[in-house]
Amino acid sequence: MKKRRSDMIKKGFDRAPHRSLLRAAGVKDEDFDKPFIAVVNSYIDIIPGHVHLQEFGRIVKEAIREAGGVPFEMNTIGVDDGIAMGHIGMRYSLPSREIIADSIETVISAHWFDGMVCIPNCDKITPGMMMAAMRLNIPTIFVSGGPMKAGVTKDGRKISLSSVFEGVGAYLGGTLDEKGLEELERYGCPTCGSCSGMFTANSMNCLAEALGLALPGNGTILAVDPARKELVRQSAKQLMYLIEHDIKPRDIVTEKAIDNAFALDMALGGSTNTVLHTLAIANEAGIDYSLERINEVASRVPHLAKLAPASDVHYIEDLHEAGGVSAVLNELSKKEGALHLDTLTVTGKTLGENIAGCEVKNYDVIRPIDNPYSETGGLTILFGNLAPDGAVIKTGAVQGGITRHEGPAIVFDSQEEALEGIASGKIKPGHVVVIRYEGPKGGPGMPEMLAPTSQIVGMGLGTKVALVTDGRFSGASRGLSVGHVSPEAAEGGPIAFIQDGDIIEIDTVKRTINVKLSDEELERRKANWKGFEPKVKTGYLARYSKHVTSASTGGIMRI
């Protein structure tokens, strides 16, 4: 009989008390020789991306039993970034990733499971589960809840949640009336699933395919498509193959696999949050992956698809109908050096074998390799005296083909102050809006800036104003928006010393971000800096603020 991890809690005379408890949980005599499987779900009623996952958990458990395993379901917490947006709730979003990873580690380690089926979907749940998978390194497969259908207005326009956020800006700017805003609200989110554009959740669930942690189709099959349930069933059965062949996450997620994930990210113009999360996943896998390496990937990978928010026409459902992630990767494989095709995946085959023959079905959605939107990827890491340790911009979602912006800073010490400034008309064409003390430590929690970016775009300033922050952006953000500025203001980074009127230059071609001040002037201002006073002094956020690291290292916790 093959020895299993779970034998720790079920084999031997001294485990009689353990078996007694397991029998009370429904385990039968014949089950004690079978692998124990953790069904790591994230069902929660208030998140539309997760409201349907209870049924997916049932499907997984049924499939595990059919394949000869014994399933046990657990749930993680979750935060809906859209609902948490614009108030203190957003400060809990990124920190929830660490709780998710820690809670999974706790349950799996305490109960000695043989493998995991992870069922995430929305923004921090997927990376939190991936971090746990790397940390635990037991056979694991991912199958997400799937994307939401795009909304459709009465006049036939496709819309998404980002359309609703931008509608608030248009309403503030007087270009949309209350009735128009209500229509966006009612039609923006028509089904369950992760929001319908290439936002953070869908970006990460697509990257799961490129990393090799999920079966093909994971990132794009709609939540309401019957094919999603079949994918859930097949994923559960595939885990049993991984257990039988002892294929573990760290066998799959290598440095080359992370290159592949970022290559897909560049081709799709994914969310800037993927940088933060993938660096954290790499850290858990014991891989030292630098921001500079991301630029190296971007330099050899073209941008092939523009989906919402970079496009008002194409959504995740369109990507799926055009061939999905496999078609994008297959198209990329036609360019030498764009992908490592020999990386292992949960299919037991290589990435190259998985994508062979997956041709693009619609070149309006996925451009051919010889006619990309740009020769370099849709994400760029910037460096300069304003961000010595790096900053991130989603170049694929910058409107009007703008590659350079120079203008005077208008500085806000919080997102709330910035929103007041935007609403009161303080932001003028040419400005560089600086929002600081919103990094991992300073926020605390590095809140997303979807409300400011959406209002700027909605007011018609999307091509006339830049935004720079040590916070981060929603995957639904677009425009000339630079986030993750490191070191952050709370750590005494240069962004803390910017004053109104300082001239900031952003150049995405040169990959630079600089403030036109001498080193001596920056040092003088630093000497007069009063330091950072934590905003939250009790509870989890206070502990998080004390121990979290920079965005440039993935916002992970110091041990």
Curated annotation (Swiss-Prot):
It is an enzyme of class 4 (lyase). It catalyses: (2R)-2,3-dihydroxy-3-methylbutanoate = 3-methyl-2-oxobutanoate + H2O; (2R,3R)-2,3-dihydroxy-3-methylpentanoate = (S)-3-methyl-2-oxopentanoate + H2O. Pfam families: ILV_EDD_C, ILVD_EDD_N. GO terms for cellular component: cytosol. Gene3D superfamilies: IlvD/EDD C-terminal domain-like. Binds 1 [2Fe-2S] cluster per subunit. This cluster acts as a Lewis acid cofactor. [2Fe-2S] cluster binds at residues 122, 195. Keywords: 2Fe-2S, Amino-acid biosynthesis, Branched-chain amino acid biosynthesis, Iron, Iron-sulfur, Lyase, Magnesium, Metal-binding. One of its GO terms (biological process) is L-valine biosynthetic process. The modification N6-carboxylysine is found at residue 124. Mg(2+) binds at residues 81, 123-124, 448. Its cofactor is [2Fe-2S] cluster; Mg(2+). The active site is at 474 (proton acceptor). Its EC number is 4.2.1.9. Pathway: Amino-acid biosynthesis; L-isoleucine biosynthesis; L-isoleucine from 2-oxobutanoate: step 3/4; Amino-acid biosynthesis; L-valine biosynthesis; L-valine from pyruvate: step 3/4. SUPFAM superfamilies: IlvD/EDD N-terminal domain-like (SSF143975), LeuD/IlvD-like (SSF52016). GO terms for molecular function: 2 iron, 2 sulfur cluster binding; dihydroxy-acid dehydratase activity; magnesium ion binding. Homodimer. Functions in the biosynthesis of branched-chain amino acids. Catalyzes the dehydration of (2R,3R)-2,3-dihydroxy-3-methylpentanoate (2,3-dihydroxy-3-methylvalerate) into 2-oxo-3-methylpentanoate (2-oxo-3-methylvalerate) and of (2R)-2,3-dihydroxy-3-methylbutanoate (2,3-dihydroxyisovalerate) into 2-oxo-3-methylbutanoate (2-oxoisovalerate), the penultimate precursor to L-isoleucine and L-valine, respectively. Belongs to the IlvD/Edd family. This is Dihydroxy-acid dehydratase. It comes from Geobacillus kaustophilus (strain HTA426).
